Amino acid sequence: MNTLFFTHQHQRSTKTLRLNYGLEGMKYIIQVYEGEINGRGEKEGLPTEYQYEFEQEMLKHVHDLKNEIRENGWFQRDTQEVSQTSFL
């Protein structure tokens, strides 16, 4: 599975998006996890999952999702590690 991480600064918290995609069993899947990092810690919701019969369909959707996410002001990160600014 491949993973992409995105962050978006939102007032006193950092919103996070994680895209996992690849072959799972006999299907190609994309899992989108939305989360948040704030003064109380980190949390991540259950994923939204998309299934595809063909790899090319999945890769096209990953490409479209990446473009849409970036157009909405999100930044792509290399890892899941994100520093949260202190508001003390």
Spans of model-derived segments:
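Short N-terminal "domain-start" leader segments
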Residues: M1-E34
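Short beta-strand segments and strand-loop junctions that repeat across beta-rich extracellular domains
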Residues: Y33-G35, D64-R70
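DNA-binding interface regions
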Residues: N2, Q31, G41, R77-T79
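Acidic Ser/Thr/Pro-rich low-complexity disordered segments
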Residues: E34-L46
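A short, exposed loop/beta-hairpin motif centered on an aromatic-Gly-Thr core
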Residues: F5-T7, K43-E57
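A short local loop/turn or secondary-structure capping micro-motif enriched for an aromatic residue
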Residues: G25, N38-R40, R70
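Short, mixed-charge low-complexity intrinsically disordered segments
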Residues: T14-Y21, L59, E68-L88
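Well-ordered alpha/beta subsegment
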Residues: Q56-K60, D64
